[in-house]
């Protein structure tokens, strides 16, 4: 068990009652609206906040237990914490900031490890600079490096992207993906941005009004129609992990395989065999009850309906099982009635557009060639 | 350069500089501690501590000197005990002048340091804590460097104010040439002496030069430290 937490804490007018565990060593997102208790939760895990009651365990070792009075101080928990506002020490250079945690770690990183982390985050050219001269994205990367260099047992990221504009966010997201895939540190990411969570998380804990309301793998949670209003998803989407099969160099296309079938997308910069993560917006999925012919879309995936939920206005959301992968489609209620859709009904999903992110490194979102 | 000054006058100048230096150095550690306490902690009696710190600003210096005299005179219980136990004598000694200056200028130091400490983001200490730094470590390596502009500004202001202290010194340790006759006391003495107008003018000019120099130095130092600390 990477992390297990039961946290009960009262503020005036707010009560946090979280209980969740992280088994997966990858990236777990704590996802929920502002004010739902996300930051309080990670502050309690880090030791910066002492909960009224509860128990927190990291890799099987308790760090807090109100029953026995155990409360390991934050400085002894070895939990890396990257704050939303980076919190670099303004009086130290980037190098001084990076060394701050490394020098105090009971297990200081070797110079080879230091070099690898600096290289991974692309901050080698910033070492002599002062934090005040860095951009927002650079600051977050240095803060990530500072936390990693203490060789933490767990890494907490509290909305590290929230204060950044789109360009800065695009600059740091690939680093977070690499971190997730290469650093071998379990990561807990706090976020209220669905896009980031869908792109980065392996597992999601959904939190609302101080309670964890759902937890599980990202594809399962994001496609659960009953959670749509809670996750604040105005536009439902499916998340699918696929393998790169081969490239059609002349056509500029790449064929991907997942357990529901195959998809052609605009060329992905990854070798065959590499894993990619697909995000497919429900509104980009059309449904047909028989195999359509003479249409421009090339990606047709068979499946059957498992659930229909009322969507906003004239729309409804349809959940499909495509060979074990979950696909969501948003169509009008009139179309659903016309096609006679209901649970169990076999359909063909026509996918108009896919966003692709490599699992292991940077890649901009790509769109399907033909719509 | 010293041709215009008599031996007694240069003696007063050096004594002034020494008294002020010792006063500032002695008051600095408690000033840093007090400023930190007032900047970051809430405790019962905080308002009282705050008022006590500021008392020397509003109390007439003569009263302060009088209070010191009745507390630390060699015949007073505390002063007698210090003298007999440690051989420490404040009354009628330059160390007494330094003590009086230290107390009078204490609020200047506390105010400047407290302001710069209050401006430090408490989140930085939290970040240091998650990186493995204990309380003293955080204070020395995060709080103190970031408060340095305030510490320097406070020290220089207090130093300049010490150079001008008159009432508390003359009341507590009297006006002894070579021992407690600092610049202001020397000016006062020159004015009281027939034919001493020229000496008074020279010493006054010296005082003005010292004060202006101190202020300029304070601004330069604060600006440099701000630049170095990246703020």
Where are these regions (language model features)?
Chain B
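Membrane-interfacial helix termini and adjacent extracytoplasmic/periplasmic loops
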Residues: 65-102, 172-177
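Transmembrane alpha-helix signature in integral membrane proteins
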Residues: 9-38, 57, 102, 155
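Interhelical loop and adjacent transmembrane-helix boundary motif
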Residues: 1-8, 172-212
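C-terminal transmembrane helix and the adjacent membrane-cytosol boundary/short C-terminal tail
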Residues: 45, 107, 111-125, 129-133, ...
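Transmembrane alpha-helices and adjacent helix-loop boundaries
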Residues: 59-65
């Amino acid at each position: 068990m990477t992390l297990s937490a039961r946290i009960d804490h009262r503020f005036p007018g707010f009560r946090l009652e979280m209980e969740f565990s992280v088994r997966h060593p990858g990236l777990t997102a704590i996802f929920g609206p502002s004010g739902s208790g996300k930051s309080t939760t990670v502050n309690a895990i880090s030791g910066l906040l002492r909960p009224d009651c509860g128990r927190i365990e990291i890799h099987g070792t308790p760090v807090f237990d109100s029953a026995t009075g155990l409360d390991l101080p934050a400085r002894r928990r070895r939990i890396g914490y990257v704050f939303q506002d980076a919190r670099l020490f303004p009086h130290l250079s980037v190098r001084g900031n990076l060394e701050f945690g490394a020098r105090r770690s009971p297990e200081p990183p070797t110079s080879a490890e230091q070099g690898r982390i600096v290289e991974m985050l692309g901050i080698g050219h910033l070492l002599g600079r002062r934090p005040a001269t860095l951009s927002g994205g650079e600051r977050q990367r240095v803060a990530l490096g500072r936390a990693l260099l203490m060789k933490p047992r767990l890494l907490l990221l509290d909305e590290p992207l929230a204060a950044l504009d789109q360009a800065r966010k695009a600059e740091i997201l690939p680093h977070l993906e690499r971190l997730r895939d290469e650093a071998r540190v379990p990561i807990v990411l706090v976020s209220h941005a669905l896009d980031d969570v869908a792109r980065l998380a392996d597992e999601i804990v959904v939190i609302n009004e101080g309670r964890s309301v759902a937890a599980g793998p990202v594809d399962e949670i994001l496609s659960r129609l009953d959670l749509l209003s809670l996750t604040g998803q105005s536009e439902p989407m499916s998340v699918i992990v696929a393998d790169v099969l081969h490239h059609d160099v002349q056509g500029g296309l790449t064929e991907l395989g997942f357990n529901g079938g195959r998809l052609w997308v605009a060329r992905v910069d990854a070798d065959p065999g590499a894993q990619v993560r697909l995000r497919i917006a429900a509104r980009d999925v059309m449904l047909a009850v028989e195999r359509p012919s003479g249409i421009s879309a090339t990606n047709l995936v068979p499946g059957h309906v498992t659930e229909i939920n009322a969507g906003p206005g004239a729309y409804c959301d349809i959940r499909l099982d495509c060979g074990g992968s979950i696909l969501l489609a948003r169509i009008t209620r009139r179309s659903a009635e016309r096609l006679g859709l209901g649970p169990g009904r076999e359909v063909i999903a026509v996918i108009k557009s896919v966003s692709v992110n490599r699992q292991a490194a940077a890649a901009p979102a790509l769109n399907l060639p033909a719509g | 350069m010293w041709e215009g000054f008599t031996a007694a006058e240069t003696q007063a100048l050096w004594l002034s500089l020494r008294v002020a230096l010792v006063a500032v150095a002695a008051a600095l550690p408690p000033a840093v501690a007090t400023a930190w306490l007032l900047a970051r902690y809430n405790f019962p009696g905080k308002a009282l501590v705050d008022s006590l710190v500021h008392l020397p600003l509003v109390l007439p210096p003569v009263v302060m000197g009088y209070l010191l005299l009745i507390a630390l005179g060699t015949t007073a219980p505390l002063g007698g005990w210090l003298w007999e136990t440690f051989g420490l004598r404040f009354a009628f000694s330059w160390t007494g002048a330094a003590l009086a200056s230290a107390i009078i200028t204490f609020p200047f130091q506390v105010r400047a340091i407290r302001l710069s400490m209050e401006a430090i983001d408490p989140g930085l200490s939290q970040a240091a804590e998650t990186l493995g730094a204990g309380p003293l470590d955080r204070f020395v390596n995060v709080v103190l460097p970031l408060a340095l502009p305030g510490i320097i500004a406070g020290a220089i202001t207090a130093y300049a104010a010490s150079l001008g202290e008159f009432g508390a010194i003359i009341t507590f340790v009297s006006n002894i040439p070579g021992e407690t006759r600092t610049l202001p006391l020397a000016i006062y003495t020159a004015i009281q002496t027939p034919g001493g107008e020229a000496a008074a003018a020279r010493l006054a000019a010296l005082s003005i030069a010292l004060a202006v120099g101190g202020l300029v130095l304070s601004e330069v130092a604060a600006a440099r430290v701000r630049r170095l600390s990246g703020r």
